[in-house]
Design a protein with these regions (language model features):
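Secretory targeting and sorting signals
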Residues: 1-28
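ATP/adenylate-binding site constellation spanning eukaryotic-like Ser/Thr protein kinases
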Residues: 11, 94-97, 199
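Conserved active-site-adjacent core of cysteine acyl-enzyme catalytic domains
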Residues: 22, 27-29, 33-51, 59-65, ...
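Active-site nucleophile-adjacent alpha helix/oxyanion-hole segment immediately C-terminal to the catalytic cysteine
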Residues: 75-122
Length: 244
């Protein structure tokens, strides 16, 4: 079990479906290396790690898989994960959970995780459901549910979030976050006229740029893997929470 930074939080009443089911997704299909059945590999620091840097974009077919190669530098640390675009408009929770699990084990399918999470067409209700499924599949008690009820978050909540990002990534545990992205405060490519309720995974950080690497299963605007400022991440999670 991890060293606890705070006590385990209670469940959040957070709906994690896309605002418009299927809006970010096109026809079904899965990318893979020619003749091998393995997903293409992606290098995450080729264009740097400043906020807004897109690592992968343009692959938005449901089920598309990419192999994200982790790196470790003096300031940055990212993890090896098996990324996959969510297969339905309301499976962001299962897809983000699958990405997180893939850092440590061969993950179940999105459909299997949707069943474990109790995901419906209304989405995945509570971040605590994600926490429980992560721990159950890994046979661990590492993951805890952390609430961020204040919007904007308090400095103590932001400090805890950054500490969780660094601690978890350094121990090979991606975070799963439940976010609310209103117009005017959205990651790249999100529908600018809608408030998006969503789950995505945090799979790395760069301490020098104070950025985090996001694996976003929705593929809004064709953006899959991108660097986001930590400060923006901290404003997207309230009033929901995250599993770390």
């Amino acid at each position: 079990m991890r060293k606890r930074l705070v006590s385990t939080a209670v469940a959040l009443a957070a709906v994690g479906a896309l605002a418009v089911p299927g809006a970010a997704l096109a026809d079904s299909g899965t990318a893979s290396d020619s003749g091998t059945g393995r997903p293409p590999a992606v290098q995450v620091l080729t264009d740097g790690s400043r906020a807004g840097t897109a690592v992968v974009s343009g692959q938005n077919e449901p089920g598309t898989r990419l192999r994200i190669d982790g790196v470790r530098t003096a300031s940055a640390h990212t993890l090896d994960v098996d990324y996959q675009v969510q297969e339905t408009g309301y499976w962001c929770g299962p897809a983000a959970t699958r990405i997180a699990l893939s850092a440590r084990v061969a993950p179940p399918s999105q459909s299997a995780l949707a069943a474990q999470l109790g995901t419906t067409e209304a989405g995945t209700d509570h971040i605590s459901q994600v926490t429980g499924v992560l721990n159950a599949n890994l046979g661990t008690g590492w993951y805890e549910t952390k609430e961020m009820p204040n919007d904007p978050p308090s400095q103590a909540q932001k400090d805890l979030l950054w500490n969780d990002v660094v601690l978890d990534i350094d121990n090979n545990y991606p975070l799963v976050t439940n976010i609310v992205a209103p117009p005017g405060n959205q990651p790249p490519g999100y529908p600018s006229d809608q408030t998006i309720y969503h789950y995505f995974s945090v799979i790395g950080y760069d301490d020098a740029n104070r950025t985090v690497l996001i694996a976003d299963p929705a593929s809004f605007g064709g953006n899959q893997i991108y660097w986001l400022s930590f400060d923006q991440l901290a404003t997207l999670i309230p009033p929901k929470g995250y599993a770390a």
